[in-house]
Amino acid sequence: MPRKERDEKRRDNKGRLLKSGESQRSDGRYAYKYIDTFGEPQFVYSWKLVPTDKVPAGKRPCLSLREKIKQIQKDLDDGIDTIGKKMTVCQLYEKYTRQRGNVRKGTQKSRQQLMKLLSEDKLGAASIDSVKLSDAKEWALRMQEKGVAYNTICNSKRSLKAIFYMAVQDDCLRKNPFDFQINEVINDDTVPKVPLTPTQENELLDFMQNDPVYAKYYDEVVILLETGLRISELCGLTPADLNFEKRFVNVDHQLLRSTEDGYYTEAPKTESGFRQVPMSAAAYEAFERVLKKRRDGRCIEVDGYKDFLFLNRDGLPKTAVNYDAMFKCLAKKYNKCHKEPLPDVMTPHTMRHTFCTRMANAG
């Protein structure tokens, strides 16, 4: 083919010479064909050949083709996956969680919660290569403005840092936009957890013991205060977990419940979670009273465990939600008739916090 004819084929409708890989479509849009890091042909498009060109009326502003080519060439030179970097944040998170599927049910629920937050926010639909440090910080601010708890934002940010780290390792990105300190962006507005003072502890137990409504919960609160058990560990206790001869409580599982799965058990998160908790004299007596007063409940077995110690009014094992509601109402009633109110945050964990504080102070 003569040189003149070849040059005419490589010029745009303005007479400008097009470089290798560049072309112009019949609608006026420019195209560039290149081979990605996997050896596959790819195309990018633009309404402008160079930055000084004007975008046709009615078309969205865009980078010129040659600006895009420059970016692509830099990515290819650096070994960046030019296709992978275009996946959305939601797609990246889905890829990350799919590769790490062997997790606890609690972790699964946390993942679902984060995916929901991402799907409802503009960050989720953004391509990962477009997310900058300032975008990540703006996301944290939006979450706090939305009313998401500080600890939830911290955990979510930690997960997002992990998925973007994977993207960097996979050569989809050069930098991790979530590599920053969260406390530099948002304030910790979490209400501090305060343990009961010795006076509050004694007065609370006296109040419960003599109250017609809360007397039935007295032994459970004594056990929590004397053992420091997590509420899910308390809920999972069966007679087989109590060793009265050697005076200890065996902890190797916890009982939980969800709307989707119903009752289920989980082992402690770490090896140190498997333990034998000593029974104090008060805990020993409380457990004896619990067994003596325990009524027969429904015949229910959860993952091989049965005969749970603490049952609700329907004869089913209690779970954390039962105690959360109880402690909230207990604190409200107690505060009405006591000058020194209980801590603002009064939950089953307050009992564990009180126990741990007492042990630490005792040395």
Each language-model region and where it sits:
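Basic, Lys/Arg- and aromatic-enriched nucleic-acid-binding interface segment
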Residues: 154, 169, 173-175, 179-237, ...
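Short, amphipathic alpha-helical segments that act as regulatory/interfacial helices
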Residues: 66-73, 112-119, 157-168, 221-228
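Short alpha-helical segment immediately N-terminal to, or the first helix within
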Residues: 143, 223-224, 358-362
